[in-house]
C-alpha cells in the first residue's frame, strides 16, 4: 500500500498506478509459479487496487439525433459530423478501414479489419448492406477511385485529427455538454 502512496505522491494518476501495480503483480505471480520466489505472505494479500474511474462514453439515441440534425455552418464541423455519423452508420467501422475501402463495389460492404488483418487468428470478413443514410454521406465524399476524400484532409492522421478536434464542438452545438 505504501508503494502506491509513494507513486500517488509523485504525481501519478490512479490509472497509471493501477497499470504499474497490475504488471508488478503479474510478474510476482509468474515468479512464484516458476518457483523463482516463495512467500510466506503474498505481497498483494492485503492490498486493494485503486478503483478506475468509469467514464460514460455512449450517446443516447436522442443525443445522436441531435448531432445528426444540428445546423452547422463551418465546413470542418460539417465534415467532422459526417465522418462521425458515417462510422456510426457503418457499424462502428474503424477510420483507417473507412478510408481504405473502395465504395465503388456496390451497396454491400465487405472488408477485413486493418487491425486484425495480419493476426494469426482467422481473418473474419465483415459484411453488411450500406444503408441510405450512410450512402448519402458517401456520395458527398467519394472520389473517382472509390475512396473517400475529405477535402484537404488526405491522410488517416489528418482526418483523425480533424474529427477529434471538432466533434466535441459539434456535440456542444447540438446541446450535448458532458
Task: Label every model-predicted segment.
Residues 14, 39-95, 99:
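Basic, Lys/Arg- and aromatic-enriched nucleic-acid-binding interface segment
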Residues 65, 88, 96, 132, ...:
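Feature representing long, continuous alpha-helical segments
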Residues 16-23, 79-80, 159, 163:
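Hydrophobic (often cysteine-bearing) scaffold residues that line and stabilize catalytic clefts
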Residues 69, 74-75, 164-178:
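Short, basic (Lys/Arg/His-rich) helix/loop patches that form interaction surfaces
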Residues 5, 9-43, 91-93:
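N-terminal DNA-binding recognition helix of tyrosine site-specific recombinases/integrases
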Residues 52, 135-166, 172:
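Major-groove DNA-contacting interfaces characterized by cationic-aromatic clusters
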Residues 45-46, 99-140:
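Conserved tyrosine-mediated DNA breakage-rejoining catalytic core shared by Y-recombinases
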Amino acid at each position: 500500500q505504501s508503494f502506491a502512496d509513494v507513486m500517488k505522491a509523485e504525481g501519478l494518476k490512479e490509472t497509471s498506478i493501477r497499470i504499474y501495480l497490475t504488471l508488478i503483480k503479474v510478474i510476482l505471480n509468474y515468479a512464484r509459479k516458476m518457483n523463482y520466489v516463495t512467500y510466506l505472505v503474498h505481497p498483494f494479500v492485503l492490498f486493494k487496487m485503486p478503483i478506475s474511474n468509469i467514464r460514460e462514453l455512449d450517446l443516447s439515441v436522442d443525443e445522436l439525433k441531435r448531432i445528426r440534425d444540428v445546423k452547422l455552418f463551418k465546413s470542418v464541423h460539417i465534415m467532422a459530423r459526417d465522418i462521425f455519423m458515417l462510422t456510426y452508420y457503418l457499424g462502428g467501422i474503424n477510420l483507417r478501414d473507412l478510408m481504405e475501402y473502395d465504395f465503388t463495389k456496390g451497396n454491400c460492404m465487405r472488408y477485413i479489419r486493418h487491425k486484425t488483418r495480419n493476426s494469426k487468428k482467422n481473418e473474419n470478413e465483415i459484411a453488411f448492406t450500406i444503408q441510405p443514410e450512410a450512402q448519402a454521406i458517401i456520395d458527398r465524399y467519394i472520389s473517382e477511385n472509390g475512396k473517400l476524400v475529405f477535402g484537404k484532409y488526405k491522410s488517416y492522421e489528418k482526418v483523425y485529427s480533424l474529427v477529434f478536434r471538432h466533434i466535441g464542438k459539434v456535440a456542444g452545438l447540438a446541446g450535448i455538454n458532458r
